[in-house]
Amino acid sequence: MKNISLLGASGSIGTQTLDVLRSHPDQFRLVAFSVGKNIDYAVKVIQEFSPQIVSVQREEDVLKLQAVSGNTKIVYGNEGLLEVALHPDAEIVVNAVVGSVGLLPTLRAIEAKKTIGIANKETLVTAGHLVMEAARKHNVSLLPVDSEHSAIFQCLNGENEKRISRLIITASGGSFRDKTRDELHHVTVEDALRHPNWSMGSKITIDSATMMNKGLEVIEAHWLFGIPYEQIDVVLHKESIIHSMVEFEDRSVMAQLGSPDMRVPIQYALTYPDRLPLSDTKQLNLWEIGTLHFEKMNQERFRCLRFAYEAGKAGGSMPAVMNAANEVAVEAFLQKRIGFLTVEDLIEKAMNHHNVIARPSLEEILEIDAATRRFVMEQI
């Protein structure tokens, strides 16, 4: 029986993580979780799983939950997130919160020697050097939950990582993969939220449409697997059947395939190095699919992917700037305050405005994050 703490239980990854726990009640126990403002959902999860600690975003929601929570301790805010991440009984902390708020709980959980199931892209993007140093220092495993990084992780199982020639990350292309730049001037929020393959939260769905999601994954892969950016490629693969590939020195390529279902990589992170049945996911029948398609990525068509490579290669504090600018811009687009292509423009402005700090401390990263958010808000 593995004890699980779940950060971000009401989001897309969080709800699917609970599906996995639900499927294997003899294997997993939920000891703590956090939610944002979805209190009705939190009540249902408490009633089903009886966790010991639950964290909410706002102090005013604490009393609402305490009235129905029985013996569950209710906490709130950033301190509450840390309490969930540091639950003494938790063996695995699944970080499924959205945004850079996931950074500090991850670092503290690593220091407490918890195994980390990492679905929060921004943690490695903004502070990859700090996270990986801490993981090495405390001998902690970072297990990828993203389908692409899980695919690479599985392809590398038993392999000599020094023999890697290239990582090939696949991209569905998002909601607007078939639209021209001119057509993108007129797309709506509703259009952007219709992802062709995956069921995800609103922020990551917009990131998929701009291709920033894939850019964040490139930076994540660099840190997780220690591969230079020059050896990480992205290929457009509309079917989302091949989740990623690894090319070795002898030019052999290993790929991980499967139906697009996030519960598969989530469960693998929780069961690693073992596997368990996942009976209600769709079996992959290649004869039904028939043909798989691949296209080279156009980084002028998908400018956010180019920004991510530029930020990653610049290193230091630049990825944190790019990430903070993107979070503010995406939120403004979702609120219909800016157009779709303005997201790219705001990110570019923020990156051009910033002078890179080569090895920023945690405090500097948090300061840069806040300053970038203020700068971008002033541009809107």
From Swiss-Prot:
Classification via Pfam families: DXP_redisom_C, DXP_reductoisom, DXPR_C
Positions bound to Mn(2+): 146, 148, 217
Cofactor(s) required, per the database record: Mg(2+); Mn(2+)
Residues binding 1-deoxy-D-xylulose 5-phosphate, per UniProt: 121, 147-148, 172, 195, 208, 213-214, 217
Catalytic activity: 2-C-methyl-D-erythritol 4-phosphate + NADP(+) = 1-deoxy-D-xylulose 5-phosphate + NADPH + H(+)
Keyword Oxidoreductase: yes
E.C. number(s) listed in UniProt: 1.1.1.267
Pathway assigned in UniProt: Isoprenoid biosynthesis; isopentenyl diphosphate biosynthesis via DXP pathway; isopentenyl diphosphate from 1-deoxy-D-xylulose 5-phosphate: step 1/6
GO BP annotations listed: isopentenyl diphosphate biosynthetic process, methylerythritol 4-phosphate pathway involved in terpenoid biosynthetic process
Disulphide bond pairs: none
Keywords: Isoprene biosynthesis, Manganese, Metal-binding, NADP, Oxidoreductase
Transmembrane segments: none
Oxidoreductase keyword on record: yes
GO molecular function: 1-deoxy-D-xylulose-5-phosphate reductoisomerase activity; manganese ion binding; NADPH binding
Residue positions binding NADPH: 10-13, 36-38, 120, 122, 201
Its job: Catalyzes the NADPH-dependent rearrangement and reduction of 1-deoxy-D-xylulose-5-phosphate (DXP) to 2-C-methyl-D-erythritol 4-phosphate (MEP).
Entries under NCBIfam families matching the protein: Dxr (TIGR00243), PRK12464.1 (NF009114)
Similarity annotation: Belongs to the DXR family.
PANTHER family linked: 1-DEOXY-D-XYLULOSE 5-PHOSPHATE REDUCTOISOMERASE, 1-DEOXY-D-XYLULOSE 5-PHOSPHATE REDUCTOISOMERASE, CHLOROPLASTIC
Protein name, as recorded: 1-deoxy-D-xylulose 5-phosphate reductoisomerase 2
Organism: Bacillus thuringiensis subsp. konkukian (strain 97-27)
Gene name in the database record: dxr2
